[in-house]
């Protein structure tokens, strides 16, 4: 039985959800079988496994996004992606 998990994430790195951060997000998301979606405050919902989709969200520092995963490893996906965002995508800045 698959479950859906969701949480809100806050973009905390100075440059926001830019190309390198987005690539890191997709790299982690791709390790999971679950469907992963990210939605911005305007309701734009994109695949968490699409660099172009994530860039379309236009998420600068401080943006609140909804992260949703549906599948057998959805809970693990949400946890890993939330940690990545909380760690500012591994960027030193």
List where the protein language model places each region.
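Short, glycine- and charge-enriched coil/turn segments that flank and shape catalytic ligand pockets
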Residues: 1-4, 43, 72
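Intrinsic-disorder/low-complexity, polar/charged segments enriched in Ser/Thr/Lys/Arg/Asp/Glu/Gln
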Residues: 2-8, 64-66
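Compact, glycine-rich, soluble single-domain proteins
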Residues: 10-60
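C-terminal structural segments of small proteins and small subunits
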Residues: 61-93
């Amino acid at each position: 039985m698959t479950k859906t998990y969701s949480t809100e994430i806050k973009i905390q790195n100075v440059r926001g959800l830019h190309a390198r951060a987005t690539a890191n997000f997709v790299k982690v998301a791709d390790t999971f079988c679950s469907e992963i979606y990210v939605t911005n405050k305007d309701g734009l919902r994109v695949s968490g496994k699409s660099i172009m989709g994530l860039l379309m969200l236009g998420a600068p520092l401080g943006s609140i996004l909804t992260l949703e995963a549906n599948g057998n490893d959805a809970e693990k996906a949400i946890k890993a992606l939330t940690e990545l965002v909380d760690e500012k995508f591994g960027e030193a800045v």
